Each structure stands twice: as C-alpha cells, then as structure tokens.
Amino acid sequence: MAREDSVKCLRCLLYALNLLFWLMSISVLAVSAWMRDYLNNVLTLTAETRVEEAVILTYFPVVHPVMIAVCCFLIIVGMLGYCGTVKRNLLLLAWYFGTLLVIFCVELACGVWTYEQEVMVPVQWSDMVTLKARMTNYGLPRYRWLTHAWNYFQREFKCCGVVYFTDWLEMTEMDWPPDSCCVREFPGCSKQAHQEDLSDLYQEGCGKKMYSFLRGTKQLQVLRFLGISIGVTQILAMILTITLLWALYYDRREPGTDQMLSLKNDTSQHLSCHSVELLKPSLSRIFEHTSMANSFNTHFEMEEL
C-alpha cells in the first residue's frame, strides 16, 4: 500500500510538471517572437554596419534556433511524459527521461555560450556614429520599413537621433525631428516642441542607448533566466521520472501485499479442500464399520429373543 501511494504521488507531480512544461514553452515562444520583432527593427537600423554584425553574433544564434527548438521539443516531450505517466509505460517514461536529458545538455551549452559572448561583442562607440547614414532615407516612400524601425526604436528606447536630436536637422531636410521623439507623442508634437519647449523632446541620442543595449546584459539575462527556470524544472522531472520508473519496475517484479494475501487465502482453501478429499475414504470406511456393527448387534438381540 505504501508503494502504491508513492506511485500515485509521483504521477500527480509529473502531471503538474508536464503542465508547467507546456506553459513555459508557450511563454518562451512568446518571448522569442517579441525578441525577433525587436531585433528585426534593430537590424534594419544597423544594416551594412559593424553594429549589425554585433547584433547577429550576440542574439540570433540563441533566440532563433535554440530557444524556439527547445520550446517546440518541450511541448512534444510533455505529451510523451503525460502518456507514459497515465499508462504507466516504462518505455515511454524512459524515452521521456532521455529526451529531457538531451535538451538539458543543449540548454547548458547554450548558457555557457551566452556568457562567453558577453565579452566578445565586436562594437565600439565610434561604430555607433555610422548610424547617421541610415537617417537620410527617413520618410521616403521607398523606405517605409526604415521609417517604421526608427520610430519604433525611438519610442522603445526613449531617445532621438544618434548623438542628439539635432542629427535629424543635419542629416535630413526636415525642419524638426519626427513625432516619435516627443515625450508625449501626438500629431505635430515635435514641431510644437521645437518652436516652444525643447524639453518635450528626448534629449539623449539613440546611439548611446543602442550601445548600452549591445554591451549590456539585460536581454541576455532574460534568456538566461528562462533557460535556468526550464532547466531546474527538467531536473525535477528527471528525478521524479527515475523514481517512478524504479517503483513501477519493482512493483511488476514483486507482487503487492493484496496479491500476497489473496494468494495465501487461495492456498489455504486449496489445502482445506485437498484435506477433505483425503479424509473421504477414511470416513466412508468408518461409516461402513459402524453400519456393520449396528447390524450385528441387532441380529444378536433377535437371536436371544
């Protein structure tokens, strides 16, 4: 009974961990999609510069192939573990354990790689000034994607221009910066701020923000946190799976207490029936002798009369 209760407890815990795998996988997919859109805008602004190379080397090998592959595999593996737990199938549980171990090793290698990449970003502050060349095509019908990227980046990082908001006046034919440079954005806000109060515009340039973005570790820390969370959950799942495999394996080799009791009762009943069968001839002989004695006594009494 104690082993059966332990198996039930292990199965419930594995159900919960598989549900957690599905939720975390969906979260990783959402974060990867957000990071992809975010980085695509950065790549649009940094095309044909050394900054583009830095972005690709730092983030894309992790975000696209590894994170997406891990979350897709975890969804499938979670289903495999759920089926194995429900059916108590040793083969499915063994596959579940082996797949989790392989994914964990991949995540561990990915984490080590991101720590090494932190000091390998090939970008300097002087490279950020080259982004000014990407400002000349802002607002042109042929470069709507570039216009969208600049607006997205300035809103997201709360910056304006590359070094200062006056970069827009120097590099383009615009009389004032885009409206995305406004602290409180609305149509025509940049023109109003340029004519009345410049403090309504973001004063810091986007070059410094992007440099901090590339040299910093905020985004990599998010990826590491997700990787560590999934890794810890995988370790717990592997421990529970091994324990459940051990319990199910020995439960099949050794009969349970109820089976032993039923076997003992069946053996006792069989022995009782066998004993009765053995005693039947003796009882029949005793009955015959008793009948003969009674008939002899009756005959003797009749002769005396």
Swiss-Prot record:
User: Which Gene Ontology cellular component terms are annotated?
Assistant: plasma membrane
Topology term for the membrane: Multi-pass membrane protein
Q: What is its main location?
A: membrane
Any Pfam family = Tetraspanin
Q: How is it modified after translation?
A: Palmitoylated; required for interaction with ADAM10.
* Tissues expressed in: Expressed in the neonatal retinal vasculature but not other retinal tissues. Also detected in the neonatal meningeal vasculature and in nonvascular cell types, such as the smooth muscle cells in the neonatal intestine.
InterPro entries the UniProt entry points to: Tetraspanin/Peripherin (IPR018499), Tetraspanin_animals (IPR000301), Tetraspanin_CS (IPR018503), Tetraspanin_EC2_sf (IPR008952)
What residue intervals traverse the membrane? 13-33, 60-80, 90-110, 225-245
What subcellular compartments does it reside in?
Cell membrane
Gene3D superfamilies annotated for this entry?
A: Tetraspanin (1.10.1450.10)
Q: Which UniProt keywords apply?
A: Angiogenesis, Cell membrane, Lipoprotein, Membrane, Palmitate, Transmembrane, Transmembrane helix
Q: What happens when the gene is disrupted?
A: Mice are viable and fertile but display defects in retinal vascularization. In retinas between P5 and P12, the centrifugal outgrowth of the nerve fiber layer (NFL) vasculature is moderately delayed in retinas. At P11, vertical sprouts and plexiform layer (OPL) capillaries appear in wild-type mice, whereas both are completely absent in mutant mice. In adult mutant mice, the plexiform layer (OPL) remains avascular, confirming that the defect is not transient.
Q: Cytoplasmic side of the membrane: what ranges?
A: 1-12, 81-89, 246-305
Q: Which residues lie on this side of the membrane: Extracellular?
A: 34-59, 111-224
Lipid attachment locations (S-palmitoyl cysteine)? 9, 12, 83
Q: Which GO terms describe its biological process?
A: angiogenesis; cell surface receptor signaling pathway; maintenance of blood-brain barrier; Norrin signaling pathway; regulation of angiogenesis; retina layer formation
Description of how the protein assembles with itself and partners: Interacts (when palmitoylated) with ADAM10. Interacts with MMP14/MT1-MMP. Component of a complex, at least composed of TSPAN12, FZD4 and norrin (NDP).
What function does this protein fulfil? Regulator of cell surface receptor signal transduction. Acts as a regulator of membrane proteinases such as ADAM10 and MMP14/MT1-MMP. Activates ADAM10-dependent cleavage activity of amyloid precursor protein (APP). Activates MMP14/MT1-MMP-dependent cleavage activity. Plays a central role in retinal vascularization by regulating norrin (NDP) signal transduction. Acts in concert with norrin (NDP) to promote FZD4 multimerization and subsequent activation of FZD4, leading to promote accumulation of beta-catenin (CTNNB1) and stimulate LEF/TCF-mediated transcriptional programs.
Please give the family membership noted in the entry. Belongs to the tetraspanin (TM4SF) family.
The entry's protein name is Tetraspanin-12
- The species this protein belongs to is Mus musculus
